[in-house]
Amino acid sequence: MARILGVDIPDNKRGEIALTYIFGIGRSSANQILAAAGVNKDKRVSSWTDEESQTIRTVINENYKVEGELKSEIRLNIKRLVDIGCYRGRRHVLGLPVRGQSTKNNARTRKGKRKTVANKKKAAKK
């Protein structure tokens, strides 16, 4: 297994797919990285040379925020929204959808498990 930026990259996968195991790198940016490094995207990770691995590392380090650096930036962005007290920040605090989705019926992922409230008992008829 090749290690790039502290992440184990699977040997049996193509380079284009293997790089997506790094947080912050998707298919599109993986293709851009491999093109900049001059590595064929269909080449398996196990057949990469040490020089190719090193050039991929340098391209990622110079041009992309990945893993811990990206996660901390995301965390700081959310903290900033909460601190200034804007609508999006309040939605983050309440654990509700941030991007304007309706919450009357759905939004179970953000709201969590249902909190069922019992109905009032109806008075017996005479």
From Swiss-Prot:
One of its GO terms (molecular function) is rRNA binding. Signal peptide: none annotated. Disulfide bonds: none annotated. GO terms for biological process: translation. Residues 107-126 have a biased composition (Basic residues). Residues 98-126 are annotated as: Disordered. The keyword Oxidoreductase does not apply. Gene3D superfamilies: 1.10.8.50, 30s ribosomal protein s13, domain 2. Keywords: Ribonucleoprotein, Ribosomal protein, RNA-binding, rRNA-binding, tRNA-binding. Pfam families: Ribosomal_S13. It comes from the Bacteria. One of its GO terms (cellular component) is cytosol. InterPro entries: Rbsml_uS13_C (IPR027437), Ribosomal_uS13 (IPR001892), Ribosomal_uS13-like_H2TH (IPR010979), Ribosomal_uS13_bac-type (IPR019980), Ribosomal_uS13_CS (IPR018269). The keyword S-adenosyl-L-methionine does not apply. Part of the 30S ribosomal subunit. Forms a loose heterodimer with protein S19. Forms two bridges to the 50S subunit in the 70S ribosome. Belongs to the universal ribosomal protein uS13 family. Located at the top of the head of the 30S subunit, it contacts several helices of the 16S rRNA. In the 70S ribosome it contacts the 23S rRNA (bridge B1a) and protein L5 of the 50S subunit (bridge B1b), connecting the 2 subunits; these bridges are implicated in subunit movement. Contacts the tRNAs in the A and P-sites. This is Small ribosomal subunit protein uS13. It comes from Amoebophilus asiaticus (strain 5a2).
